[in-house]
Structures are given as structure tokens and as C-alpha cells.
Amino acid sequence: MSKLNKTILADFEAAQIQRKLPEFNQGDTVVVNVKVKEGNRERVQAYEGVVIGTKNAGLNSSFTVRKISHGFGVERVFQTHSAIIDSVEVKRRGKVRAGKLYYLRGLEGKAARIKEDLAAAAQAKAARQAAAKVE
């Protein structure tokens, strides 16, 4: 691919990446609000679970969220810059060392729990309090 084509492609991708989501990593518990179209109406559906993996590839970036629904593990891959994602909220920060948490698929119950990163939680709380003082 020529340099001109790469430049045009990079400019197009930069224009498509419109909004910023909050920063989250593997092990974090997030709530992803997804736009769901049913017939002629649209509603927002919440999907809460643990981020088990992320893929950072510019416009093709994605993240995988795993939750337990009625005793079964359900995983869903979301495109980071997709129009169907309404918002993402980080509920709690997990403390993990692995890049991909695929080992959670084989664990059940208490074994599948992830320790909370208390330092990150304290920083987030301080940031929220500072923002509240500004308002």
C-alpha cells in the first residue's frame, strides 16, 4: 500500500473514532449499555460482567465481557468504537496479572472471583470528590 493510501486510511480512521470511553483493563467489572433495536423502537440494555480481554487495533479495537447468566457463562465481544454502545461504566477495578483472563472459563463460584484493586478504587473516589468540589 502506498504512503498516500495509508495517510488517507489513517485520516478516515481518525474521523471514525469519535468518542472516548472510560479507561478499563482486564479484570475490571463493567456495565456496557447497548442499544437494542426491536421492531421499530430502540431501547438500551445493560450488560454487566468482567472484562476478560481487550484487542487494541485502532478502529477495529474490541473487548470481551464475561458474565454468568442463570448458571451459564456468557461472553460477548464488543467493538470499542461501535455505534451500538451507548455507554460504558466501570463498577470495580480488578487486580490481575495476566493479559487475557481466559482461565476464568474453567472456574466456578468463589474460585472465579477477582480481587479488587483498592489503590485504583481510592484514586477513582478522590477524582470523583474533586470533580464534585468543582461543580
Swiss-Prot record:
GO terms for molecular function: structural constituent of ribosome. GO terms for biological process: translation. One of its GO terms (cellular component) is cytosolic large ribosomal subunit. Keywords: Ribonucleoprotein, Ribosomal protein. InterPro entries: Ribosomal_bL19 (IPR001857), Ribosomal_bL19_CS (IPR018257), Ribosomal_bL19_sf (IPR038657), Translation_prot_SH3-like_sf (IPR008991). PROSITE patterns: RIBOSOMAL_L19. It holds the Pfam family Ribosomal_L19. Gene3D superfamilies: 2.30.30.790. This protein is located at the 30S-50S ribosomal subunit interface and may play a role in the structure and function of the aminoacyl-tRNA binding site. Belongs to the bacterial ribosomal protein bL19 family. NCBIfam families: rplS_bact (TIGR01024). This is Large ribosomal subunit protein bL19. It comes from Xanthomonas euvesicatoria pv. vesicatoria (strain 85-10) (Xanthomonas campestris pv. vesicatoria).
